[in-house]
Design a protein with these regions (language model features):
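Short, hydrophobic, well-ordered secondary-structure elements
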Residues: 1-8, 102
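Short, charged low-complexity intrinsically disordered segments located at boundaries
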Residues: 5-8, 28-30, 48-53, 131-139, ...
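Short acidic alpha-helical/loop segments enriched in Asp/Glu that coordinate divalent cations
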Residues: 5-18, 118-121
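Alpha-helical structural elements
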Residues: 11-14, 36, 54-55, 59, ...
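Hydrophobic, well-ordered secondary-structure segments
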Residues: 11-18, 22-30, 62, 168, ...
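Short, surface-exposed, charge-dense and proline/glycine-enriched linear segments
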Residues: 17-21, 39-46, 145-160
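Short, mixed-charge amphipathic alpha-helical segments
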Residues: 20-107, 111-118
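Polyanionic, low-complexity intrinsically disordered segments
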Residues: 73, 77-195
Length: 195
């Protein structure tokens, strides 16, 4: 569906994330457009000398939901430390939750990545949202903060996909367009040839 909805996109990742952001329910779409400061930090901290994250590390099991304002503020602070405006835009785009879901999809589909992560849900929450957790480890008898981990619960991903598909099909019905490209234009038919 994403390639049919965004046929002029030169990158599958762009059409995938644009599809999710445009056609899923607004409550999901808003989250998908947010930038994850954790993946941004770990990807660029050495290159741009970010220093430390400005998140609370005092509490064992500290969890931040994707909608937490502290995460948005930290993402914006980190982006401002990237000197080039074009690099800022590229970094921001690569670390939206929609793009991170695409990256996870690729790891599973193309690299046969096992999703055997630690528990990736938040207790006592009906709606599971992406969140980050500070891991800890014991050194002797001391509990030492480790690194931050991003968790995108399966329930969230499934809900986003179903919402986007439903939104896209509704859009196609309202605008009287076929949801798929004509078979003769599908990219897989030309995969044997150079363009």
């Amino acid at each position: 569906f994403s390639q049919s909805a965004f046929p002029n996109s030169h990158h599958t990742s762009s059409s995938f994330s644009s599809f999710l952001e445009k056609f899923s329910e607004p409550s999901y779409s808003d989250i998908l457009k947010m930038i994850c400061p954790i993946t941004l930090y770990y990807n660029y901290h050495k290159k741009y000398n970010f220093g430390n994250l400005h998140l609370n590390t005092r509490y064992y099991g500290k969890t931040y939901s994707a909608t937490d304002s502290d995460l948005s503020e930290e993402a914006q602070r980190l982006l401002k430390l990237i000197p080039n405006e074009k690099d800022q835009r590229n970094a921001a785009q690569k670390h939206t939750y929609s793009r991170l879901i695409y990256q996870r999809r690729n790891k599973i589909a193309h690299e046969f990545y096992a999703v055997g992560l630690s528990l990736n849900f938040q207790e006592d929450r009906e709606n599971q949202l992406p969140h980050i957790v500070l891991s800890h480890e014991f050194i002797g008898e001391d509990l030492i903060p480790g690194h931050w981990e991003l968790n995108i619960p399966e329930q969230f991903t499934t809900s986003v996909f179903l919402s986007a598909i439903k939104g896209y099909l509704s859009y196609c019905e309202q605008n009287q367009i076929l949801p798929f490209k004509p078979e003769s234009e599908r990219a897989y038919r030309f995969s044997w040839y150079d363009k």
